[in-house]
């Protein structure tokens, strides 16, 4: 697993872990417990997070050769709303271009956890290339979720 962040956190640093926990209110022990589990998972199997801006990093990654038989996946959660408009457009353009290049031997999937267009719900959405019946960009909502992961209502 690879990822990108403008300022990746160093969870091996005790100060960083303590600071993260300080953002959780004392009356929210379930959130603190989830964060402690996430930190432990991260420390046991640290992801490869590179310091960079999202759109250029994504364009570079998606331009790399894809192994036959492997499904390339882009996953993001609650990030699009924070990207400047030009960067958001560039990232989405890279995703759509990767989808257009996908084949049955080199499929592509895009999984996003983001607000829907009218911000009435947070959707976990999967888009696949090639899609069902050979269609490109077949998309469906897998779940409706709490914005911070407190609950998930699976839809399929």
Language-model regions, residue ranges each:
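A short, conserved alpha-helix within the catalytic core of class I
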Residues: 83-95
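Conserved SAM/SAH-binding loop
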Residues: 52-57
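Class I S-adenosyl-L-methionine-dependent methyltransferase module
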Residues: 1-51, 63-67
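Short coil/turn segments at beta-strand junctions that form active-site/ligand-binding loops
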Residues: 45, 69-71, 106
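A short SAM/SAH-binding and catalytic strip from SAM-dependent methyltransferases
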Residues: 72-85
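Domain-level detector for long C-terminal conserved domains
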Residues: 16, 22-34, 47, 89-91, ...
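Short, well-ordered amphipathic alpha-helices
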Residues: 58-60, 92-99
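Short active-site-adjacent structural elements
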Residues: 58, 82-84, 119-122
């Amino acid at each position: 697993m690879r990822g990108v962040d403008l300022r990746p956190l160093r969870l091996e640093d005790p100060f960083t872990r303590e600071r993260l926990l300080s953002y959780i209110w004392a009356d929210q022990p379930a959130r603190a417990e989830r964060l402690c589990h996430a930190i432990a998972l991260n420390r046991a199997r640290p992801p490869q997070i590179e310091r960079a801006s999202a759109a250029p990093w994504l364009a570079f990654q998606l331009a790399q050769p894809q192994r036959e038989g492997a499904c390339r996946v882009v996953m993001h959660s609650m990030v699009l709303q924070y990207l400047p408009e030009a960067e958001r457009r560039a990232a989405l353009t890279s995703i759509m271009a990767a989808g257009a290049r996908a084949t049955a031997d080199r499929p592509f999937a895009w999984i996003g956890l983001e607000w829907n267009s009218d911000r009435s719900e947070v959707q976990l959405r999967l888009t696949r290339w090639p899609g069902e019946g050979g269609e490109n960009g077949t998309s469906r909502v897998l779940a409706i979720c709490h914005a911070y992961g407190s609950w998930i209502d699976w839809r399929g």
